[in-house]
Amino acid sequence: MISSPSTSTASASSSKSATSDLFDQSALSALAQRLVEAAKRAGADAADAVAVRNISQGVEVRDGRVEESERSEGDDVGLRVLVGRRQAVVSTNDVSGDGVAKLAERAVAMARVAPDDKYVGLADPSLLARDFPDLDLLDPKVPSTSELERRACEAEAAALAVKGVTKSGGASASTGIGGMVLVTSTGSHGSYLRSSQGISMTAIVGDGTGMERDYDYTSAPHASDLASPAKVGRTAGERTVARANPRKVETCKVPVVFDPRVSNSLVGHLVGAVNGASIARKTSFLKDRLGEQLFAKNIRIIDDPLRVRGLRSQSFDAEGVKVKKLAIIDEGVLTSWLLDSATARELGLVTTGHAHRGVSSSPSPGSYNLHLEAGEPTPAELISDIAQGFYVTDLIGSGVNGVTGDYSRGASGFWIENGEITYAVSEVTIAGHLFEIFKSLAPANDLEFRYGVNAPTLRIEGLTVGGR
């Protein structure tokens, strides 16, 4: 599955020399163009097509030996057709001449019997992207299988070197390149090439019912932006050892502090609630809150599709619409929904350029590189006045109601006493309401851009920690 175009045809072509043995973007472009032309011949009033090629390779090791090494490669195409206000989406991996023609005919036949939807349609041509910045998403160096094995083994060795780690849960290293072309019957055309690199490690302490495990990982388009394998392994080992011999706590209402590894989930809940599809269906607890103060005035939450080397960067969306940096929360105020063309029409607004799609699905709203801006206090200062509190490092389950805003999740982490992180805690729940969570949220100054959604350490007042 793909998201949407992320660099211009020009920038994709300029990178081709480094990957000419792996990719032929001109062939993908021609394929997408044939799909659109075939749809028009079959009777579609409008159409768009995506053609995708992905190549990936991964190595998994345990106890210094390769357990699995695999490589995958594939082409997929997706076609969306419109007959009047009726829409159908089809996909296939049969990219032969007959396959393309049959796919177009099937799509048009499906659209003719689909229900009318007055909100469907291609994007307004006046909103399409014209300028395509180079976001530097393609690493020209493709690591070999032996290099991937070296990275995984180094991460595992570093974890096992941490005192207290008893065994390896496995380490892995991966690489991949994805290419995608979008063509529409209105003349929009764009493509991208994007690389991906990753290293992960899981460590274990104890055994039987006393076993604890933890992990670390790093991912980026460029290998030079990855954390070192040794750091990944060492962090996984240290986190695992710290979790040993967890205690239970009594149910109480205390400040809860979210480690950056999990604090981004709170941003994710906000973004789910401002998704245009949820707003249009009236299934979001924020449906009537646009323009209201939800957070403290020092809080800004940014969606930035144009971050250089960002994990989710792209210069136009899945409908070809121009994208831009957007402050969803500015000085604590909710400023915007995330919209594609269809949800924008339904709400009487203009798309914000947030359309995403897979080859087998129609466009729908999604986000890019999200982050909650850092505050001023250090993490230590943020917890220094907490007499009793809970520091969360892992969340379990998904007990969050997007309609009501009720929040309840399983968690593990560490107990805070007199401003210090003390012993490990497991098997608790944390509960509250997202309105109250947003209102009291206070950030530390340790923001790092490691994931698609990023936030610093966050402190929330008065959540219920359910224990014994």
Feature roles, as predicted:
Residues 1-468:
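N-terminal small-residue-enriched
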